[in-house]
């Protein structure tokens, strides 16, 4: 009887010791792989960004007279990476030298390449808002003007965004120089300018306009990605598509 009881106690001690030392018995972090997973703090981390919806933009303009608004084009209204990707493969596969090649700009803006660009849903919603209000809409792009003076980007935008003839303004090709868009924003008295790049926001402020950020699509070929809200500007929610 004593021997049986002693054996039982020994078995209990051994079982308990095994339970304590077992790596699968209790929740531990020892088996986690480095750089995988996230803590709850990381999952719920928020950045101090002034998010705004298109509905809120509409509400802020309610009851106001028509204004002049400006739009950047690439990654703001159009997901144009397909055209830029093709241009890179054609003119400089191993570098971004194609962006300084006038032949590329001639091709992308006057040879129908933008028919392969995808109009963004957020762009369509913003365009519909401003056209319904009777606002004057201007397209100011950082692309250089085609050397032959002919472009088909205006027609592409007209078709993609269903812009009536009496509300259509031709695309302004501001070019790539520093602050290139500022003079056109001032010339056309732009009140709000929508763009995806830091330069868009900064140019708008230099021109006395409000720059509102539109999110650049994650799969854009235009890298590096900007830091949205970096200047305290309003950022359109869900505008990456």
Swiss-Prot record:
GO terms for molecular function: acid phosphatase activity; metal ion binding. It is found in: Periplasm. Binds 1 Mg(2+) ion per subunit. Substrate binds at residues 141-142, 181. Its cofactor is Mg(2+). It comes from the Bacteria. Mg(2+) binds at residues 72, 74, 196. InterPro entries: Acid_phosphat_B-like, HAD-like_sf, HAD-SF_ppase_IIIB_AphA, HAD_sf. Residues 1-27 form the signal peptide. Its EC number is 3.1.3.2. It catalyses: a phosphate monoester + H2O = an alcohol + phosphate. GO terms for cellular component: outer membrane-bounded periplasmic space. The active site is at residues 72, 74. The keyword Signal applies. CDD domains: HAD_CBAP. Pfam families: Acid_phosphat_B (PF03767). Keywords: Hydrolase, Magnesium, Metal-binding, Periplasm, Signal. Belongs to the class B bacterial acid phosphatase family. Homotetramer. Dephosphorylates several organic phosphate monoesters. Also has a phosphotransferase activity catalyzing the transfer of low-energy phosphate groups from organic phosphate monoesters to free hydroxyl groups of various organic compounds. This is Class B acid phosphatase. It comes from Edwardsiella ictaluri (strain 93-146).
């Amino acid at each position: 009887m004593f021997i049986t009881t002693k054996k039982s106690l020994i078995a209990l001690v051994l079982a308990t010791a095994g339970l304590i030392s077992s790596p699968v018995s209790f929740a531990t972090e020892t088996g986690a792989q480095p750089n995988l997973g996230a803590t709850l703090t990381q999952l719920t981390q928020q950045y101090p960004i002034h998010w705004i919806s298109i509905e809120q933009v509409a509400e802020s303009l309610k009851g106001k007279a028509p204004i002049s608004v400006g739009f950047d084009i690439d990654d703001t209204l159009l997901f144009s990476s397909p055209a830029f990707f093709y241009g890179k493969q054609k003119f400089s596969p191993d570098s971004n030298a194609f962006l300084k090649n006038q032949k590329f700009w001639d091709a992308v803006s006057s040879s129908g390449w933008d028919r392969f660009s995808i109009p963004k849903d957020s762009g369509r919603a913003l365009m519909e808002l401003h056209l319904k209000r009777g606002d004057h809409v201007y397209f100011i792009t950082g692309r250089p003007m085609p050397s032959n003076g002919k472009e088909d980007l205006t027609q592409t935008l007209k078709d993609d965004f269903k812009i009536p003839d009496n509300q259509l303004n031709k695309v302004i090709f501001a070019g790539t120089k520093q602050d290139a868009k500022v003079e056109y924003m001032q010339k056309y008295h732009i009140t709000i300018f929508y763009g995806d790049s830091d330069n868009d926001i900064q140019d708008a402020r230099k021109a006395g306009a409000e720059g509102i950020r539109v999110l650049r699509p994650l799969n854009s070929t235009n890298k590096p990605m900007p830091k949205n809200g970096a200047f305290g500007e309003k950022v359109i929610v869900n505008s990456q598509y």
